[in-house]
């Protein structure tokens, strides 16, 4: 049974590639708009599930990995900014504060219909940043505008961070890898074979 990553994120592809298992990556079909009254956790889990299941018709005998990440601050969901200025405003709001990232993962076995889900929680405290620092960061890391809150931990994004608390460091990049290894094992895929 082949493995499909329902994502075009190169960072997520790099994480999955670390397992040394063959896989392909395809864009999922998914409206990422949160539903009214939905918590950040519920949004992340639902979107990971929808992304995984959206490719089932194309892959009737596959293990499809869907993932989604939703950030939360002051009980407000933080999504991807709509542009540069929105990214600046998001990072100004998050500056010096602790943001909770919910990184959901769904593994869908299209042959059996079995769905496994998990969530990795990461608490990230950002440094106090000036507006000039924020603008310089977003200019030098334009990919950050495709991330929740315009914040990434990879590359120059490390300069934004003061502290990271998580059971799985991969979760902050959007894939709770430790839990994925267990899920794959439940489907008979042994990573260390």
UniProtKB/Swiss-Prot annotation:
Catalytic activity: N(7)-methyl-GTP + H2O = N(7)-methyl-GMP + diphosphate + H(+)
The entry's keywords: Cytoplasm, Hydrolase, Nucleotide metabolism
Family: Belongs to the Maf family. YceF subfamily.
Record keyword Cytoplasm present: yes
Enzyme Commission code: 3.6.1.-
BP terms from Gene Ontology: nucleotide metabolic process
Subcellular location: Cytoplasm
Disulfide bond annotation, renumbered to this chain: none
Gene3D superfamilies: 3.90.950.10
Cofactor(s) demanded: a divalent metal cation
Entry-linked PANTHER family: 7-METHYL-GTP PYROPHOSPHATASE, BIFUNCTIONAL DTTP/UTP PYROPHOSPHATASE/METHYLTRANSFERASE PROTEIN-RELATED
Function: Nucleoside triphosphate pyrophosphatase that hydrolyzes 7-methyl-GTP (m(7)GTP). May have a dual role in cell division arrest and in preventing the incorporation of modified nucleotides into cellular nucleic acids.
Active site: 68 (proton acceptor)
Keyword Ribonucleoprotein assigned: no
Site location (Important for substrate specificity): 11, 69, 154
GO terms under cellular component: cytoplasm
GO function terms (MF aspect): nucleoside triphosphate diphosphatase activity
Superkingdom field: Bacteria
Record-given protein name: 7-methyl-GTP pyrophosphatase
